[in-house]
From Swiss-Prot:
Tree of life domain: Bacteria
Binding site for (2R,3E)-phycocyanobilin: C85
Signal peptide, first to last residue: none
Location relative to the cell: Cellular thylakoid membrane
Family statement: Belongs to the phycobiliprotein family.
Organism: Synechococcus sp. (strain ATCC 27144 / PCC 6301 / SAUG 1402/1)
Designated name of the protein: C-phycocyanin-2 alpha subunit
Segments traversing the membrane: none
Taxonomic classification: Bacteria, Bacillati, Cyanobacteriota, Cyanophyceae, Synechococcales
GO cellular component: phycobilisome; plasma membrane-derived thylakoid membrane
Gene3D superfamilies (alphabetical): Phycocyanins
A biological process from GO: photosynthesis
PTM comment, free text: Contains one covalently linked bilin chromophore.
Keywords: Antenna complex, Bile pigment, Chromophore, Electron transport, Membrane, Photosynthesis, Phycobilisome, Thylakoid, Transport
Reported function: Light-harvesting photosynthetic bile pigment-protein from the phycobiliprotein complex (phycobilisome, PBS). Phycocyanin is the major phycobiliprotein in the PBS rod.
Length: 163
């Protein structure tokens, strides 16, 4: 079983032959509330993925116009290049939803950030493009309250890792 604050609290209480304390139960309640917010955010982001990805790609093209005028496989000067850009932005968004469901940065760290520098150098991709895309998603996802806070925490984590 993987260790989490909840499993550690249960293990500690069990080893001491006691029920969970009020404080431990409050932590558990808070984690479940956070999980519900994360799941709601993941669902909303997934439902709006197409419009968020397209808007984010256009934000990248606006801020970095050379991406649509520079020829080559790694730029958005062709329909194929634009499709690759949208695919990559969609991947970033998908990983954010995985983190929301998992309740931690593990999916971001393991599926995205591990080896990302190598990929970006190999394919001449600029992290600043994805930072701009993520900023657009954060500003336009339409979430509110705890769901917004949960989503923004993972988007900010990713932006900081790319910056």
């Amino acid at each position: 079983m993987s260790k989490t604050p909840l499993t550690e609290a249960v293990a500690a209480a069990d080893s001491q032959g006691r029920f969970l304390s009020s404080a431990e139960l409050q932590v558990a309640f808070g984690r479940f509330r956070q999980a519900a917010s994360g799941l709601a955010a993941a669902k909303a982001l997934a439902n709006n993925a197409d419009s968020l990805v397209n808007g984010a790609a256009n934000a990248v093209y606006s801020k970095f116009p050379y991406t649509t005028s520079t020829p080559g496989n790694n730029f958005a000067s062709t329909p194929e290049g634009k499709a690759k850009c949208a695919r990559d932005i969609g991947y970033y968004l998908r990983i954010v939803t995985y983190a929301l469901v998992a309740g931690g940065t593990g999916p971001i760290d393991e599926y995205l950030l591990a080896g990302l520098d190598e990929i970006n150098k190999t394919f001449d991709l600029a992290p600043s493009w994805y930072v701009e895309a993520l900023k657009y998603i954060k500003a336009n996802h339409g979430l509110s309250g705890d769901s917004r806070d949960e989503a923004n925490s993972y988007i900010d984590y990713l932006i900081n890792a790319l910056s």
